Amino acid sequence: MSKLEQFYFDAKGNRWFQYFTVFCRIALALGFIPSGIVKVTGERFTALPAEHPLGHYFDALFQTGYYYTFIGIGQLLTAALLLIPRTALLGALLYFPTILNICVLAYATRFEGTRITTLMLLGSIYLLCWDYDRVKYILPFKRSNAAAYPAKKKIISNRFPFLFFGGVILTIASVIIINIFIFDIRPGNSLEECTNGCKGSNYAKSACGFCDCIYNKGKPLDSCLKEYKRAKQREMDSLKTAINK
């Protein structure tokens, strides 16, 4: 048995790992319940304006009728499965592709909620890893003969895993910091938020032009980003020319 497998089996029998697993299940379920209820009741999911890239997507999704309701039912079902210990693995299997899609969508539209969706995705991956002893049989990887070391369900250790939780804190901090610098400009959640952000930019004119392109002209995100990059380049060239003079 490898050291990684030994660590896994030890973790399954650790009280603090089990507490963290329960926390992840509850937190991820709570992330789906409000949005699921909104969809089932036939209400619009967010207050994002239709001109916002993600708001435009949600507007189109809202117009799909019972498909919109179906998504809400799926989210509520997934949340319920996560909260029930016997069905938690099935809930995690359903949760992962859903949150992966949401996370990619958030990054593609430069939504402000990328931090939350990233942490939710990492949480779902953790839950799948927690039940590795049950899902390993469908994975295309070579498995060692660890049948003699079943994953322990009973608590056999109360030792606090400082290294693991230190890694969790470091991961959360990394997600927050990376998301601050990953995009040089975002559309914000409204025109006001976008314009307030562009005033503090080194290229305020280009940034404000980007906000105007998104919210007033209603152009696609890719088109506005291209215009922003061209305008930013002109500002940079003008600044260099002024410095050389």
What is the meaning of each model-derived region?
Residues D10-W16, V22, E51, Y57, ...:
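Homeobox/homeodomain signature
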Residues R15, G72-G74, P85-R86:
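Short, glycine/acidic-rich beta->alpha junctions
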Residues G55, G72-L81, P97-L105:
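Hydrophobic, membrane-inserted alpha-helices
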Residues M1-T41, A88-K245:
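Extended, low-polarity transmembrane helix blocks
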Residues G31-I71:
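Solvent-exposed, well-ordered loop and adjacent helix/strand elements within mature globular domains
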Residues V38, L81-L82:
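Short beta-strand segments in beta-sandwich/barrel cores
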Residues D59-Y66, L83-A92:
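Short, amphipathic, aromatic/basic-enriched membrane-interface segments that mark the entry/exit
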